[in-house]
Amino acid sequence: MLQSCIIQNSKQENCEQIEIIIREINEGGIKDIVFSNADGGVFYINRGLERGLTLQGMKNKVLNKKVTLHLAKIITGTSSNHIAQISLGEEVIYTEFN
């Protein structure tokens, strides 16, 4: 059962792409950066604070703006809330893609 929650592959073709307006940014989990939208959706960059990102930097960049998220899929093919890439227009803010 636990294996079905594992993110298998953070490649662009294995992600769901959505657009949201970021309404809130906080720290959660273990150094995760957590983004919320107006509809109650919650998405996160796993250990984002260990990857050179800061809460204030993300707030300055994307708070109250429309961004594109690439959400990694778990082994079953269902989309997770794990952000594999976040973009603002043409600018990639963070990516796990090579």
Task: Describe the role of every protein-language-model region.
Residues 1-2:
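Sec-dependent bacterial lipoprotein signal peptides
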Residues 8-31:
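Structural detector for short beta-strands of small beta-barrel domains
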Residues 16-22, 64-67, 71:
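OB-fold and OB-like beta-barrel modules that bind single-stranded nucleic acids
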Residues 29-49:
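OB-fold (S1/OB) nucleic-acid-binding surfaces
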Residues 46-52, 97-98:
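A short, sequence-level motif marking secondary-structure junctions
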Residues 52-69:
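Short nucleic-acid-contacting surface segments enriched for D/E, G, S/T with interspersed K/R
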Residues 74-98:
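OB-fold/S1-family single-stranded nucleic acid-binding modules
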